[in-house]
Amino acid sequence: MVVPEFRSPQCRALCTKLLLTLWVFSFVGEACKKVTFHVPSTLEADKIIGRVSLKECLSSADGIMPSDPDFRVLDDGSVYPTRAVVLSDEKRSFTIQLSDSKMQTQKEIPVILEHKKKVLKKRHTKETVLRRSKRRWAPIPCSMQENSLGPFPLFLQQVQSDAAQNYTVFYSISGRGADQEPLNWFFIERDTGNLYCTRPVDREEYDVFDLIAYASTADGYSADLPLPLPIKIEDENDNYPLFTEAIYAFEVPEGSRLGTVVGTVCATDKDEPDTMHTRLKYSILEQTPPSPGLFSVHPDTGVITTVSHYMDREVVDKYKLIMKVQDMNGQFFGLISTSTCIITVQDSNDNAPTFRQNTYETAVEENTYNVEILRIPVDDKDMINTANWKANFTILKGNENGWFKITTDPVTNEGVLCVVKPLDYEENRQVTLEIGVNNEAPFIKDVANRIPTMNRAMVTVHVKDQNEGPECKPPEQYVRIKENSAVGSKINGYKAYDPETKNSNGLRYKKLQDPKDWVSIEEVSGLLTISKTLDREIMAPRNDMYNITVMAIDQEGKSCTGTLAVNIEDVNDNAPEIIQDYIVICKPKMGYTDISAVDPDEPIHGPPFQFNLANTSPEVNRIWTLNQVNDTAARLSYQKTADVQIYNVPVTVKDRAGQSATKILRVNLCDCTHPSQCPLRSRSAGITLGKWAILAILLGIALLFSVLLTLVCGVVTARKGKHFPEDLAQQNLIISNTEAPGDDRVCSANGFTTHTANNSSQGFCGTMGSGMRNGGQETIEMMKGHQTLDSCRVAGHHHTLDSGRGGHMDTDNCRYTYSEWHSFTQPRLGEKLHVCNQNEDHIPSQDYVLTYNYEGRGSPAGSVGCCSEKQEEEGLDFLNNLEPKFLTLAETCTKR
């Protein structure tokens, strides 16, 4: 194939134009999806129309250019009119050109703005009379710029009504800004309808004024309907965006990952929302310290995040950011405000504690404990007095016996090593410990790598020797010795030793406790010497060890105490012994009896026992037989022909080792049914009384005689003390129921005659009624009755009372003589009779019935009875304590 060569200049120019055209068309890409917006007929300036998805068309567009200058498109695809646009047609279209300079790609997005008019439905035509409806005057959209510079009054628009064609119309307005607050900001010319504003307006104070226009004739007729006339204030970017806080304070963990949210800043703008005046962009203006840059802020949301993982609190613990916010979507002509943001880096446990040395050495004396022996310092760069800084020490090796304990000093954060159990120089002269340290909070690198890391150090503890005195080990030692060993024999004693020399040289021994004082101890050797006979059977309990407490003392006076347990081996030093001494056998009911024996020795020297009759006399062997029952008992039987009496039966018992003893049993062969019925006289016949028993018997007999003598004397004294019979009246009442003075109570001077035949006689001779005494008798005559009382016999102390009514009574010893009785009663009876005779005419007798019918003034005597006061006599108190023999008479008189 032959390629023609274009050599002419015309051909070359044509080829150049063709290549240029192809190059231009290479930048023109295919059109993206068409976007349609339904909008009103009038579009306000800077009011969003809609949003176009730019990334769906070209994801990496760095150039955005609308084909129509009346519109602008932001980075997020928002479409705004740059001025007020009125759609004359139903549609208006333009394109958004997107370009990517790196990829050398260009695409277009068709945008269509549609305005749909309302279509009225067709109505069926009817044959009606056509009327012309009154057309309403329509307002023209009106607005004014915020903070307008005038000149004022500023013309806004002209309002005209169709009624002006037929009438002379006058215009007026009302509403806020005209005749309402704020007043007179707007007015309208009455004749022309021109609307004016008188002053600048702040949109943030008043964003719209809703006025109402009126058209009326001169006579006040409303030529047209009132017209709403809104006046919108167009926003001006006159307000700076402001942060909500002057200083923000945030915290972020140390070593945070990329993209960790630190906090959010926020700003507000008072300008009209959803306009460029309030589209804010955030940015970081300055960071202190300046490098490296660790933070970024989202331009639209204000969210601050980390952009680096290198954030170390130990290097920088606090950052200061100067935040900037700018309206007009961050364009260079937007208004700017700033704020301060303080970011504090929170501490994380990213620094492990470390020992300052790898090895440590210390020393401690043996046998000391609860003492501090070493302080181990550590370094930690984390924040002081936090869980990331506080150290936690652990003994990893060398403390298997629990000798040591390590704690943390909360002030210095040092490890404090202490000895809690005493160390023994002889056993461990040196101890090596491995100490580990970490923090209370987990190490973040351990968590991330899941590999525990712990700093470690070695500690060598040297144990110092100390004279700790002798040691009694074991605390109990045992020794065996035979019972009844010879006094003065020696046995091994308690052995203590010096832990340093491992022997007992230089130690002295001392006995502290020996319950029976059986042994003595040698001071130097510690050997025990038997000082008394050892008797195992007196120990309680017998099979227990005999414990001796011993003290070992070294040359410096230090001591220890141990126990020597002596096991006393039993020997057959005790013969078996029969328990019974006296036995009762009831014949013929009981044909035998059992006897038993005991041996205090060990069982090896004890049963089985052998029982035998020790007496070889034919009489004993003929009557008694002895048969073995078991190891410790035998049965003693008798012949039926044996007589009932007490027998002395000798029985020999022998243990298994041949040790034997003989005992004579007193066997009472008795004719009874039960042993308790057998008399004990035979049993006690052989009993002899001691001197103390005889003395006790004599004292008992003397005491018995003294008691009997006291009783006899008491009976005699009681009989002598009885004076009168208990009842001289023989329980007979004297009849004295007359209205006149009784003959048994009233004494008369004429009727009371006393004749004394013998005044020298002893005793008390009493009368009841009248009586007489002749030849040693005493006669007493009274008004009524006759009684004779024999003379009181002094020698026999026996008195006889013969009653006039036939009564008879004997009395015992008299208390008074007759002269004493006569001298006592005679003056008083005479005085009584004399007083009665003197007052007989003046004082009525109290034994007669008297009438008291005078109701006048009171009686001078003060009583309706007899003169009781005059009847009272001195010296008659003895009548208040009568003897029992007079009580019956006194009670009878009192009842009356």
Swiss-Prot record:
Under SMART domains, the record lists: CA, Cadherin_pro
Tissue specificity, per the record, is: Expressed in the basal layers of epidermal stratified epithelia from birth (at protein level).
Extract the PROSITE patterns matched here.
CADHERIN_1, CADHERIN_2
Pfam families recorded: CADH_Y-type_LIR (PF01049), Cadherin (PF00028), Cadherin_pro (PF08758)
- Which residues are on the Extracellular side of the membrane? 136-695
Q: Which residues lie on this side of the membrane: Cytoplasmic?
A: 717-896
Give an example GO molecular function.
calcium ion binding
Which UniProt keywords are present, listed alphabetically?
Calcium, Cell adhesion, Cell junction, Cell membrane, Cleavage on pair of basic residues, Cytoplasm, Glycoprotein, Membrane, Metal-binding, Repeat, Signal, Transmembrane, Transmembrane helix
- Give the UniProt subcellular location, in the record's own words: Cell membrane; Cell junction, Desmosome; Cytoplasm
The residues that cross the membrane are 696-716
Ranges for the Cadherin domain?
Answer: 136-243, 244-355, 356-472, 473-580, 581-691
Q: Which residues form the propeptide?
A: 32-135
Output the Gene Ontology cellular-component terms. cytoplasm; desmosome; extracellular region; plasma membrane
Signal peptide residues are 1-31
Q: What happens when the gene is disrupted?
A: Knockout is embryonically lethal. Embryos die before compaction is completed at 2.5 dpc. Oocytes and sperm are fully capable of zygote formation. In stratified epithelia conditional knockout mice, 10% of mice develop severe external epidermal blistering which is exacerbated by mild mechanical stress within hours of birth. Affected mice die within a few hours of birth. Intra-epidermal blisters show acantholysis just above the basal cell layer, later stages of acantholysis show lateral separation of basal keratinocytes and at the bottom and roof of the blister half-desmosomes are present.
What are its GO biological-process terms? homophilic cell adhesion via plasma membrane adhesion molecules; in utero embryonic development
The reply to whether Transmembrane helix figures as a keyword in the UniProt entry is yes
- Report the membrane topology from the UniProt record: Single-pass type I membrane protein
| Residues annotated as glycosylated | N166, N392, N547, N630
Quote the record's domain comment: Calcium may be bound by the cadherin-like repeats. Three calcium ions are usually bound at the interface of each cadherin domain and rigidify the connections, imparting a strong curvature to the full-length ectodomain.
Tell me how this protein assembles. May form homodimers. Interacts with DSG1; there is evidence to suggest that the interaction promotes cell-cell adhesion of keratinocytes.
What the protein does?
Answer: A component of desmosome cell-cell junctions which are required for positive regulation of cellular adhesion. Required for cell-cell adhesion in the epidermis, as a result required for the maintenance of the dermal cohesion and the dermal barrier function. Required for cell-cell adhesion of epithelial cell layers surrounding the telogen hair club, as a result plays an important role in telogen hair shaft anchorage. Essential for successful completion of embryo compaction and development beyond the 8-cell stage.
Q: What is this protein called?
A: Desmocollin-3
| Protein source organism | Mus musculus
Upper lineage is: Eukaryota, Metazoa, Chordata, Craniata, Vertebrata
